[in-house]
C-alpha cells in the first residue's frame, strides 16, 4: 500500500494575512523539480505534490507556526492512509506572505491500480484558519517503465537540484521497474539520455548511454540509474530519458523541461 509520507514546508516569507489559501498545486519530478504533466504513475513510483501556502500569520519575530496533514483515499473514496496534523515552524526571513509546501507519497510495488486522491490540509496555528487542496492521481497496472525520476545536485540523489545555473552539475536519477530477466537470471536494460535544445535538436550527436546486465540480486525488483548532465550554457532544454528491456523487447521514454540560467 502507499506509505512513506513526507511533508515539508520551506519559507519564502509570509506576512499578516486576511485569509489562508493553498494555490499553484502541481505535480513535479522530485522535490523542487520541474512540473510533471502526467498524473499517471506506475507502482513503485513517487508522487511529489508542490503548492503554495498564502496568507499565513507571521509573529513579530518572523516566526510562522502552522500544521500540515495529509490523507490518501483509494478507489471508491475510502481512506487508505492518514497522517495526523504535524506542527511546523519557519522564520519569515525575506518578508512576503507565501510559503512553498510539498507532499510526497511513495506508491508501493504492489499497489492496486485505480484513481487515488491526495488531500492536504494546512492550519494557521495563530489565526486558526484552515485551507485544503486535493490532487487526483491514477495508479497504472504493473508494467515495464521508469519511476522515481528526480533531479539532484549530488550523485547520491539527496540534494534537490532546484533552480539551475550555468556551471552546475545536474544528476538525473531514475529507477526501472517491470523488467524481465534472461536465461542467466540477469536483466538486460539499456538506458539512454538525450538533451534537446529549444528547437528540438539534440545537443550532442550521440546520447549518453548505460546498461544494467550483471550483478543484480535475484529478488531485486528495481534497477537504479543515473546520468550526469553538465550545464555549460544557458537556455531552455528538454531532457529525454529512455529505457529498453532487451530481454522483453520493450522501450519506454520520459521527458521533462529544464531552464538553465546565466549566473552573474
Which residue ranges define each predicted feature?
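Sec-dependent N-terminal signal peptides
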Residues: 2-12
Amino acid at each position: 500500500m502507499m506509505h512513506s509520507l513526507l511533508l515539508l514546508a520551506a519559507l519564502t516569507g509570509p506576512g499578516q494575512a486576511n485569509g489562508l489559501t493553498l494555490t499553484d498545486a502541481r505535480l513535479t519530478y522530485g522535490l523542487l523539480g520541474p512540473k510533471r504533466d502526467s498524473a499517471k504513475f506506475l507502482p513503485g513510483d513517487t508522487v511529489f505534490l508542490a503548492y503554495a501556502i498564502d496568507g499565513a500569520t507571521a509573529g513579530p519575530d518572523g516566526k510562522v507556526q502552522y500544521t500540515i496533514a495529509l490523507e490518501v483515499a483509494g478507489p471508491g473514496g475510502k481512506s487508505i492512509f492518514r497522517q495526523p496534523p504535524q506542527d511546523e515552524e519557519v522564520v519569515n526571513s525575506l518578508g512576503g506572505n507565501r510559503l512553498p509546501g510539498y507532499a510526497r507519497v511513495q506508491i508501493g510495488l504492489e499497489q492496486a491500480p485505480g484513481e487515488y486522491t491526495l488531500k492536504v490540509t494546512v492550519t494557521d496555528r495563530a489565526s486558526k484558519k484552515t485551507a485544503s487542496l486535493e490532487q487526483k492521481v491514477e495508479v497504472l497496472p504493473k508494467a515495464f517503465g521508469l519511476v522515481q525520476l528526480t533531479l539532484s545536485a549530488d550523485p547520491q540523489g539527496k540534494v534537490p537540484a532546484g533552480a539551475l545555473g550555468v556551471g552546475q552539475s545536474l544528476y538525473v536519477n531514475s529507477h526501472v521497474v517491470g523488467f524481465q530477466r534472461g536465461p542467466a537470471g540477469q536483466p538486460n536494460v539499456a538506458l539512454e539520455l538525450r538533451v534537446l535544445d529549444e528547437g528540438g535538436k539534440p545537443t550532442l550527436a550521440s546520447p549518453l548511454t548505460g546498461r544494467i546486465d550483471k550483478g543484480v540480486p535475484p529478488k531485486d525488483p528495481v534497477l537504479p540509474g543515473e546520468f550526469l548532465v553538465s550545464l555549460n550554457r544557458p537556455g531552455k532544454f528538454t531532457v529525454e530519458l529512455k529505457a529498453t528491456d532487451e530481454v522483453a523487447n520493450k522501450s519506454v521514454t520520459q521527458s521533462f523541461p529544464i531552464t538553465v540560467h546565466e549566473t552573474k
